[in-house]
């Protein structure tokens, strides 16, 4: 895993199918202050049973989409992370 620095507490928000699978609309999670997005996604998938939608999830850090899962994310205490599956509709 590629993670550095101290551990911080972030607020994770779940939307649509991810909310259903996680069985909660939000959670507080301890994460390294620096972590590669793909490693973070793997941790969330395992902890919240999101494997069935992993390949379709979008992450957003403080309302900014994480577009490249190889990017390192820098977290501060109390930051927000959204877990967003593709939205369907018509």
Swiss-Prot record:
Domain of life where this protein originates: Eukaryota
Alphabetized GO MF terms: molybdopterin synthase activity; nucleotide binding
Glycyl adenylate modification, residue list: 90
Post-translational modifications: C-terminal thiocarboxylation occurs in 2 steps, it is first acyl-adenylated (-COAMP) via the hesA/moeB/thiF part of MOCS3, then thiocarboxylated (-COSH) via the rhodanese domain of MOCS3.
Protein's cellular compartments: Cytoplasm
CDD domains: Ubl_MoaD (cd00754)
Pfam families documented for this protein: ThiS (PF02597)
Pathway annotation: Cofactor biosynthesis; molybdopterin biosynthesis
Entries under NCBIfam families matching the protein: moaD
PANTHER family: MOLYBDOPTERIN SYNTHASE SULFUR CARRIER SUBUNIT
Protein name: Molybdopterin synthase sulfur carrier subunit
């Amino acid at each position: 895993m590629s993670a550095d620095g101290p551990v911080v507490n972030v607020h994770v928000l779940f939307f649509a199918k991810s909310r259903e699978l996680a069985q909660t609309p939000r959670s507080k999670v301890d994460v390294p202050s620096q972590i590669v997005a793909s490693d973070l996604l793997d941790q969330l998938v395992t902890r919240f049973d999101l494997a069935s939608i992993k390949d379709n999830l979008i992450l957003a850090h403080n309302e900014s989409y994480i577009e490249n899962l190889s990017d390192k994310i820098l977290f501060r205490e109390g930051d927000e992370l959204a877990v967003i599956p593709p939205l369907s509709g018509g």
